[in-house]
A protein has these predicted regions:
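Short beta-edge/loop segments at beta->alpha junctions of small alpha/beta modules
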Residues: 18-98
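Acidic/polar active-site rim loop that often engages polyanionic ligands
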Residues: 85-88, 149-154
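Hydrophobic alpha-helical interaction segments
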Residues: 8, 20, 152-235
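Polybasic, lysine-rich low-complexity intrinsically disordered segments
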Residues: 10-12
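Functional cation/ligand-contacting sites centered on basic and imidazole/sulfhydryl donors
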Residues: 1
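Short gly/ser-rich loop at a beta-strand->alpha-helix junction or flexible surface loop bordering the NTP-binding
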Residues: 69-78, 88-147
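Hydrophobic/aromatic-lined pockets within catalytic cores
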Residues: 49, 111, 176-180
Length: 235
C-alpha cells in the first residue's frame, strides 16, 4: 500500500468518526430541547427532516433508550439524555387529555394525607381509563364537563406547567369516586377524614369553602356528601 493511499484512508476514517460524533452531538442537542415534555411521534420525526424514513429513526431512538414510549405515538426523552427530571404530573396531563391530577395523588402532593400513593390518579371528561407505562401506572376517572373546571389550577414548575385539582376539589373527586363513601351525617365526615384518609386536620380547617359550594352548584357527583362535608367544615 502506498503512503498516499494510506493517508487518504486515514482521512476518510477520521471524517467518518468526526461526522458520527457531530451527528450524535446534534441529536442529543435536539432531544435536550424537548426537555421533560411528552411529545408525539410527528414532533420527533420533524427533528430529522433530512431523513427519508424518520419513523425508523423514532424506532431506533426507542431501541437505543434515547426516548421512552408512554403509549402508541407518545414519548418522553430519557432523562439521562435530556438532563431534565421527568414529572409524573406533566406526563399524566399529556397521557390522556384533557385531564388534571386529583384525588389521593393531589392530596398527597399537597402533603394533606400521610399514605404513599402508587397510582397517578386524574380526572377527565373522556371515558374512564387506565395506562401502564415504564414510568408508572396512571388511572383516569370520568367527571362531567360542568364539574371539570371547578377548583382546578395550573402549577408552574420552571419551564413547564401542569393542571392539578385544588385540595378541596381533590377531596370532592376522591369522595365521588369512593363507592363505599356516603357522608350523610357529621359523624360520617369525622370518621372519613380522620380515620379513613387521615387528613391533616389543621390543614382541613384551612380549606376554601367556596370550592365546595361551587362543586355543589354544578351538581357534581355525590354533591349530597359534599354538602355534609361543608357543614362539618363550617360548624
Amino acid at each position: 500500500m502506498s503512503i498516499w493511499i494510506y493517508f487518504e484512508q486515514k482521512k476518510m476514517l477520521q471524517f467518518f468518526y468526526y461526522s458520527k460524533y457531530y451527528y450524535i452531538c446534534n441529536m442529543n442537542k435536539l432531544l435536550k430541547e424537548i426537555g421533560a415534555t411528552p411529545v408525539t411521534t410527528s414532533i420527533i420525526e420533524s427533528l430529522y427532516p433530512e431523513l427519508k424514513s424518520p419513523n425508523k429513526k423514532v424506532a431506533l431512538l426507542e431501541k437505543q433508550s434515547y426516548i421512552i414510549r408512554l403509549k402508541r405515538g407518545l414519548y418522553v426523552v430519557n432523562p439521562e439524555h435530556s438532563g431534565k427530571t421527568l414529572s409524573t404530573e406533566l406526563i399524566a396531563n399529556h397521557l390522556y387529555a384533557p385531564s388534571y391530577i386529583s384525588m389521593s395523588t393531589a392530596l398527597r402532593y399537597y402533603g394533606l394525607i400521610p399514605e404513599a400513593v402508587y397510582v397517578n390518579q386524574s380526572m377527565t371528561v373522556k371515558h374512564s381509563r387506565s395506562f401502564k407505562t415504564p414510568l408508572g401506572n396512571y388511572d383516569y376517572k370520568y367527571i362531567s364537563r360542568e364539574a371539570f373546571s371547578v377548583g382546578v389550577r395550573s402549577l408552574h414548575m420552571g419551564d413547564y406547567a401542569f393542571l392539578i385539582a385544588s385540595p378541596e376539589k381533590a377531596l370532592c373527586d376522591l369522595i365521588a369516586n369512593s363507592s363505599k363513601v356516603n357522608l350523610r351525617y357529621l359523624t360520617d365526615v369525622e370518621h372519613y377524614i380522620e380515620e379513613d384518609i387521615r387528613i391533616d386536620m389543621e390543614e382541613f380547617y384551612k380549606l376554601d369553602a367556596t370550592v365546595f359550594e361551587d362543586y355543589i352548584k354544578v351538581g357534581g357527583k355525590k354533591a349530597d356528601s359534599i354538602v355534609t362535608l361543608l357543614k362539618y367544615l363550617k360548624r
